[in-house]
Regions:
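N-terminal leader/auxiliary helical segments
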Residues: 1-86, 94-256
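Aromatic-lined, polymer-binding surfaces characteristic
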Residues: 91
């Protein structure tokens, strides 16, 4: 993570800097680009309440360095659809690898819990974008894939199957809609039953708080830095796919 809106917003802002060919491909396969922006996060939604081998793939892939992960997945980007998913996936890595060290630092020093800070940053971005009641924003509309698109995505995440990918995406959309339900007291009560702070903290705060002002501003600096960093990462990926040139130190960090 960051949370879902930050990744989706980040991907939309990247589009203007894409080359014309990539923009045309994204228009053709927009669902793949949009879901690529969420990267391996989709596996966290497979079954959030029970540990499963498929659900744990989210942690497995997030722990891999960019060099390890992208050296492997570039082999799946030969098709137009595969490249479009890769373009979104690179956006996920670019934002995660810059923001996660900061989020983990704030969690370690007791300033904020991991998911709590990410949910607040989503609220901050939505408010900045003119959404009057950010906690009511339903961002699930783009969370969908066709069966064929699930086949494309599964190739990036062995041993996940297309059926696994379909379940992850469908559950992600359901969870997103549930979190913005009109009866927040009922939603909060159900979340508390999980006894998992990471799940409870996904409920976006209704209002900002002074304790977040500095952290939101620092997260925004990292977010903007990631926007500037993306073209260089894409250039390295393209060179790697053309010539086999090893990925450089920019890909050394893990997703986080």
């Amino acid at each position: 993570m960051p949370a879902n809106y930050a990744h989706y917003r980040f991907g939309k802002q990247l589009l203007s800097g894409m080359c014309p060919n990539d923009r045309r491909s994204i228009q053709r396969f927009r669902r793949l680009y949009d879901m690529g922006l969420h990267g391996p996060d989709i596996f966290f939604y497979y079954n959030p309440l029970i540990k499963t081998a498929t659900g744990q793939l989210g942690g497995v892939f997030h722990a891999q360095s960019g060099q390890e992960f992208f050296t492997r997945v570039c082999a799946q980007a030969g098709s137009e659809a595969g490249r479009v998913y890769l373009l979104g996936l690179l956006g996920h890595y670019c934002l995660d690898s810059l923001c996660h060290p900061y989020v983990e630092k704030k969690e370690a020093d007791g300033s904020a819990r991991h998911v709590e800070l990410e949910s607040e940053f989503d609220r901050y971005l939505l408010e900045s974008d003119g959404v009057v009641l950010p906690h009511t924003y339903d961002g699930s509309a783009h969370m969908r894939l066709t069966r064929g698109e699930c086949v494309t995505v599964a190739l990036f995440y062995p041993p996940a199957t297309p059926a696994n990918i379909n379940a992850c995406v469908r559950n992600m959309a359901r969870a997103t809609r549930f979190l913005v339900g009109k009866n927040r007291k009922h939603v909060r009560r159900l979340l508390r039953l999980t006894r998992s702070p990471a799940i409870e903290d996904q409920l976006m705060p209704e209002h900002g708080d002074d304790r977040w002002l500095w952290m939101d501003s620092e997260m925004l600096v990292l977010y903007n830095r990631a926007l500037k960093r993306y073209p260089g990462l894409l250039s390295q990926l393209d060179e790697h796919m053309r010539t086999g040139e090893p990925l450089g130190q920019d890909f050394a960090p893990a997703f986080g």
